[in-house]
């Protein structure tokens, strides 16, 4: 008999809008699709930068089993203590001595703070990993880097879910038992620029000067999650769910399957 496991992965949760979208939508989808385990990237969940203890407990209380991160993982000072007490994961290739358990959440190189090589660190992590169903959150800027990572580990892990850009991509696929999507996309403000109020980013592009980004609070929200179905370590099915305020039905996209 098939040993099926269903895992939900929620893309970058950004600010209050993202948390409320998750709290409103995740419990019903957990029941509907009988999810066994849920992972979410929450490095932007508190004001768009980092994760506080209060917000971590809030998200874990609505059904999330593990929280991943990226370049904003350490933006809030209380997160170090949280990593010792709660299922909050730092990028595995963060420098040695950094807090956190380092289960497979990796950070890319291009356009991000310097870390150890994600490709080499992933090889090292897999050698010591005894889990049957392996899901990697690859938090990276460049789709080319994510694609190269997928090609290296295709057939060796169950799923690779890209995060960081906040913009969902249309390339969900399954090849050699490995599901892949370049970016799941944010859960947060649908209006604005990658979850932030539009004014500051637009000014930055117009003037070339830095402006303080603020989370867009008065907005339509979007919730985005990919569901992976694993059978003995291989992904056999995957689909993405999008829920947007004002759109009556959830939008569902199934993975393209290749032999």
List each model region and its residues.
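Acidic, metal/ion-coordinating pockets
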Residues: 1-259
């Amino acid at each position: 008999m098939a040993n099926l496991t269903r895992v939900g992965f929620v893309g970058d949760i950004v600010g209050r809008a993202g948390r409320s979208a998750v709290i409103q939508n995740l419990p019903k989808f957990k029941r509907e699709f009988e999810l066994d385990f849920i992972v979410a990237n929450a490095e932007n969940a508190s004001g768009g930068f980092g994760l506080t203890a209060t917000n971590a407990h809030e998200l874990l209380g609505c059904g999330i089993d593990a929280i991943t991160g990226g370049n904003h993982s350490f933006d809030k000072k209380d997160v170090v203590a949280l990593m010792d007490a709660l299922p909050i994961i730092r990028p595995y290739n963060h420098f040695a001595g950094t807090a956190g358990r380092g289960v497979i959440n990796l950070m890319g190189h291009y356009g991000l703070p310097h870390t150890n090589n994600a490709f080499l660190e992933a090889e090292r992590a897999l050698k010591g990993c005894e889990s049957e169903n392996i899901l990697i959150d690859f938090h990276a800027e460049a789709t080319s880097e994510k694609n190269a990572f997928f090609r290296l580990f295709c057939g060796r892990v169950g799923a690779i879910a890209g995060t960081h850009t906040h913009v969902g991509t249309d390339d969900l696929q399954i090849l050699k038992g490995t599901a892949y999507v370049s970016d799941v996309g944010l859960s947060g403000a649908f209006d604005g620029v990658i979850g932030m109020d539009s004014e500051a980013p637009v000014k930055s592009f117009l003037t070339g000067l830095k402006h303080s980004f603020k989370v867009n609070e008065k907005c339509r929200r979007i919730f985005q999650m990919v569901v992976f179905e694993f059978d003995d370590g291989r992904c056999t099915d995957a689909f993405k769910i999008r829920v947007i305020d004002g759109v009556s039905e959830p939008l569902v996209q199934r993975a393209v399957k290749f032999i």
